[in-house]
Amino acid sequence: MKLSKYVSLAEVTRSDTAKRKGISNEPTPEHLENLKTISEEVFDKVREHFGVPIFISSGYRSAALNKAIGGSATSDHNNGRALDLDQDGHGNGVTNMDVFKFIKDNLEFDQLIYEFGTDKNPDWVHVGYRKGANRKQVLRAIKEGGKTKYVPYK
């Protein structure tokens, strides 16, 4: 099933953990609508801008899957409002930093997170989108005392 021009349902629900543990990762109808919205409003625009495939490393997570991986109970992945994009290592000249900057400077989003990495490039990019209620919050994820901490991106 296609969610948008460039995104399939299989792509955003794919999970090795779900397969391995026999966990259903099927979105509810409401979550499916959210996935369609973020795919059209964010992902497709990133894909069109760069003109190369963009890779989703994490999309939708059912409550059971989120618990199995130790994810945050308040994560927007749980309701189909977030995607993690990891462009590095695909040999098409587009980096995670390129994706991060394009989203930050050009698109509507609720939350954009520069996930770990170095000052020059994040390990991946988390982007959340809420229909009609976007905060444009830009954060950086860092490790502090063995725990993840979110600080304003500078």
What do these predicted ranges mean?
Residues 1-47, 145-154:
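Extracytoplasmic cell-surface/polysaccharide-interacting catalytic and binding patches
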Residues 38-42, 65, 81, 95, ...:
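Amphipathic alpha-helical interface surfaces
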Residues 41-70:
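Extended, low-complexity, intrinsically disordered C-terminal regulatory tails
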Residues 54, 83, 124-125:
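A broad, low-specificity signal marking well-ordered, structured residues that form hydrophobic/aromatic
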Residues 69-85:
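Active-site microenvironments of hydrolase-like enzyme catalytic domains
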Residues 87-154:
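Catalytic cores and adjacent binding grooves of peptidoglycan-active enzymes
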